């Protein structure tokens, strides 16, 4: 299956189980892998034959920056649901969401989740 990839999308949001996360907010890193049949687009080179990744980015940004979730698992599920609803050609989605600086003690590069959904 062909893929459209958006990697390292950075958004500021207020998601998390800790009160500090819900009031102060933080940066969220979102990676998306969209399974889409790109055969027609590869032959026509027309935007109408594919999923516009700029529109995907805007859709995800509106959700991450405009809503609040206690768990990023819920945010990831909502991203999948919204993208399936807005972009019918998407057959499957892999989404990873990471927090670089959650309010937990320790040394790490990031914490996060990854999930995959199919129509």
From Swiss-Prot:
UniProt: substrate binding residues: 21, 53, 72-73
GO CC term (a single one): cytoplasm
E.C. no: 4.1.2.25
Pathway: Cofactor biosynthesis; tetrahydrofolate biosynthesis; 2-amino-4-hydroxy-6-hydroxymethyl-7,8-dihydropteridine diphosphate from 7,8-dihydroneopterin triphosphate: step 3/4
UniProt GO molecular function: dihydroneopterin aldolase activity
Pfam family for this entry, one: FolB
CDD domains: DHNA_DHNTPE (cd00534)
Enzyme superclass (EC): lyase
Catalytic reaction equation(s): 7,8-dihydroneopterin = 6-hydroxymethyl-7,8-dihydropterin + glycolaldehyde
InterPro entries listed in its UniProt record: Dihydroneopterin_aldolase, FolB_dom, GTP-CH-I_C/QueF
Highest taxon listed in the record's lineage: Bacteria
Any GO BP annotation: folic acid biosynthetic process
Family annotation (Gene3D superfamilies): 3.30.1130.10
Keywords annotated in UniProt: Folate biosynthesis, Lyase
Annotated active site: 99
SUPFAM superfamilies: Tetrahydrobiopterin biosynthesis enzymes-like (SSF55620)
PANTHER family in the record: DIHYDRONEOPTERIN ALDOLASE 1-RELATED
Role noted for this protein: Catalyzes the conversion of 7,8-dihydroneopterin to 6-hydroxymethyl-7,8-dihydropterin.
Family in the record: Belongs to the DHNA family.
Protein known as: Dihydroneopterin aldolase
Origin species: Streptococcus pyogenes
